[in-house]
Amino acid sequence: TPDLAWQRFSLAIQANKQKLATYLVRFLAKKDRQLATSYKKAHTRPSEIKRISRYKTQNPHVRDIVLHGIKRLARHQPEEALSTFRQYDEIHSFDPSASAETFVYIGKHLSYEDDTSDLLENLPIDPSDYPELVEARIRKALRDDDWSEVLILINLLPEKFQHQPGWRYWKARV
């Protein structure tokens, strides 16, 4: 079926299996082949996703492309990815869990950058629901020698994470 073909194509792109994705294009419906080209382009040149006018169509496949492209962009330009995704978030009705997952992904990559603390604090998700994001923010606070932030963030972690030896050490050290 066309939906199954798109699903497999999407999984191939996400797994970075370009040859498999190219092979799977032949099984897509004719109307989806142009979107497949856009998907590949968003994968290989993530900055392409910043052209918002190209991806305004309300379509589940377009939303797949946008989410994937934003994640790819976040790997090297997390600040750009965040601002671009906020614009898309106003246009498209993303699934809340997919949207939150994308914000977490962007947040983790923002934590590797300097001077992004304000952006991290203003992500539209509750950090206590995403321990991997909190851990990334703790590591950033440690790099920045922001001890009060380290303590605040460690306390945001769920109990089972707080009792891990590494976080117990830093909590005691602070």
Q: Which residues make up each language-model segment?
A:
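Non-catalytic extracellular/periplasmic "stalk"
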Residues: A42, K50-I52
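Generic helix N-cap/helix-start motif at coil->alpha-helix transitions
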Residues: T1-Q7, A15-L20, F27-A36, R45-E48, ...
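Non-catalytic all-alpha helical scaffold/repeat segments
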Residues: R54, P78-S93
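Inward-facing hydrophobic residues that define packing positions of alpha-helical scaffold repeats
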Residues: L24-V25, F85-R86, L120-L123, I154-N155
